[in-house]
Every structure is written in C-alpha cells, then in structure tokens.
Amino acid sequence: MAAEGRVQRVASELQKVISLLLRTKIKDSKLATATITEVELSKDLSYAKVYYTCLDIQEAQYISKAFEKSKGFFRSSIAKSLNLRIVPNLKFVYDKSLDYGMEMEGKIQQALEADSKIIKQDDNSLQENYKDSDKETKVEKLR
C-alpha cells in the first residue's frame, strides 16, 4: 500500500516537472503547446507513460516526434530536479480522452437539439388540440 502511494507521488512530481520544462525550457513553440494530462509509473519506478494532448490535432504527429527526440533532455532534467535512484524511461503517448470528450459533447448537443425540436412540435400539437377542444366546448354551451 505504501509503495502505491509513493508511485502516485512520484508520478505527480514527474507530471509537474515535465509540464514546467515544457513551459520554461522548451524552445520549440509547437512542442511547448502540449499539455501533460497524466503520468503512469511502473511499480519499480523504471518506466513512465507520459500522456499528453494538444489543441491542434494536426500537430499531434509532429509533437509526438518532437517528444521522442527530446526524451534525453527530459530524463536529464528530471534527474536534476528529483532525487530518484532510477530516472524512469519515458514513453510519450497521445491522450485521446480530450478528443473523445469533445466528440461526446457534440453528440449530446445534437441530441438536445433534436429533443428541443420534438418538444416544440409536441407543444404546438397540444396547443392546437386545446384550441380545438375549446371551440367544441363553446359550441356545446351554445346548444
């Protein structure tokens, strides 16, 4: 249990350090636009999957290659920042959850629009039915 807590703490620190490096030390403006969303660390702290996302999907492939080229820089900077016996091997993975979330949001918006159209149609038909029944009531009163 204690080891899991340490793994999570180190993963959190790795995320902070890599994010800080992206903001302050990376000169590649496209790579600097990437956001680190999560870091998964192996139990022995030797491997880390670093999940990232970027606002421009067309830049994802470029950013992936840039991360691969910059692995050594990130590892050496992590070694200087964190007091770890072993600096984990980094694997950068594009995080598709943001894209998936935006896709789901679009589908929800479409469903809400379709529902509002149906509700408007139902309201209109109810109003027409009410008007028709109101006319019939008036005619019956006249008889």
Curated annotation (Swiss-Prot):
InterPro entries (alphabetical): KH_dom-like_a/b, RbfA, RbfA_dom_sf, Ribosome-bd_factorA_CS
BP GO terms, sorted: maturation of SSU-rRNA
Keywords: Cytoplasm, Ribosome biogenesis
Single Gene Ontology MF annotation: ribosomal small subunit binding
Cross-referenced SUPFAM superfamilies: Ribosome-binding factor A, RbfA
One Pfam family cited in the UniProt record for this chain: RBFA
Region of interest called Disordered, as start-end residue ranges on this chain: 123-143
GO cellular component, one term: cytosol
PROSITE patterns, sorted: RBFA
Compartment(s): Cytoplasm
Self-association state and partner proteins as the record states: Monomer. Binds 30S ribosomal subunits, but not 50S ribosomal subunits or 70S ribosomes.
Protein's job: One of several proteins that assist in the late maturation steps of the functional core of the 30S ribosomal subunit. Associates with free 30S ribosomal subunits (but not with 30S subunits that are part of 70S ribosomes or polysomes). Required for efficient processing of 16S rRNA. May interact with the 5'-terminal helix region of 16S rRNA.
Cited NCBIfam families: rbfA
Family membership: Belongs to the RbfA family.
Name of the protein: Ribosome-binding factor A
Name of the gene this protein is made from: rbfA
